């Protein structure tokens, strides 16, 4: 190992004053003293200094000291940038603080320096394990950058620059990125972001998403990923786009179905899926039991596979959320969770962790959850690709009484877009089984007013062929009750009686019991 010394400075948050200094040489010789003069003596003629986030933290304090002493500044190696590149499956990249028994105990800069040194050794081994083409691609992108130049110099890695870096990337990531990606632009303008994006794609089958540190410091990484994997081209020779944006292939891959459901001969389900895949906002009126869940689940799962995108499904009923999640899990589709009041603290914490780490493509929540700071934090930290509003008729006049919090959805989406920079609108899909024109118009008006969204509409117009309707005219409550008893007695089968109030349900149930119906067969809610 070449001579290298890892340094860590402890600085007060309020006054930005250095209160402790630690360092460790590559031969494990430590330094621990709050003295820059003695630190410079310890660093005398060291060709490299390293640290964890040294570029954005420690170096701003060290550089003036080198200049003041007239010393040449050693080359810099930052293990934080390397960790995010070489261990992309990790969500967090901060140094562990397992030596601290108490949270308020000061950090030990010597221990942190040693941890950085040990991490650097792991990073060298990780780079060695990469295939030769990926090594050359990383070198071609990063050897001239402040973040990575010192690393390549330290390990004496200086291959000939690839003549066609774009072509090499396309060859190395064949069928994993679009062949029409603007690689030349990305190489020139966003080399670090492109390197991080390729690193993520290289481990794409892992459960984690884009590391939070990368998202914070290189927000363009998400945009780069979209250019590579989420912008369909029309080139028939692009194997990636032919598969990644093909709804029928996705249907077969995730749900094992060969074809979409039709409505009276119309391919509305397939058309709605295609619109969602293409990033359009849509309003779908499909009958209950008509396959509307798959219509929004499939594009969500496909987006999760492409760019670790998160689709947020807002549903008014906890039981409905649980049922849909359970059904997906039964089909071995595990990248979906719900966060609601039915979960115990352990289940809730686990669901939150999965959303945060990027292993979830579909999140079911209630409209009330949008007021939760935890939910807001989770969504800010993820690439939210779409909001799906189930039972969207709750926006209409009747829905305001049933679920007032539905009226906050538009405000929340606008707030989330602003927190993410406001440059990209998040598409919305609304699903309902209610085909009344005034209800549909209420939904359209709401989203146009709140988010300037114009929906592409898919209306089945189908009726439930397994349901038959009949209307009876009665003059009073006694006549209504008598007719109800006759219907129940004439049909030896389970029945559901709907009334407008819980109290009325209890009264009807009690009266039926008193009139000779078995107690155990009658329930009211």
Region locations from a protein language model:
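Short, glycine/acidic-enriched loop or turn micro-motifs at the edges of active sites
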Residues: 11-13, 55-56, 81, 393, ...
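Interdomain "pre-motor" coupling segment immediately N-terminal to P-loop NTPase/helicase cores
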Residues: 191-245
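Structural motif
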Residues: 4, 47-50, 310, 386
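Acidic, Mg2+-coordinating catalytic module of metal-dependent nucleases/exonucleases
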Residues: 95-180, 184, 189
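Helicase motor core with emphasis on the C-terminal RecA-like subdomain
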Residues: 233, 239-255, 267-271, 277-283, ...
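Entry/capping segment at the start of metal-dependent catalytic domains
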Residues: 1-19
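Conserved DEDDh/DEDDy metal-dependent 3′-5′ exonuclease domain
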Residues: 25-96, 100-102, 106-127
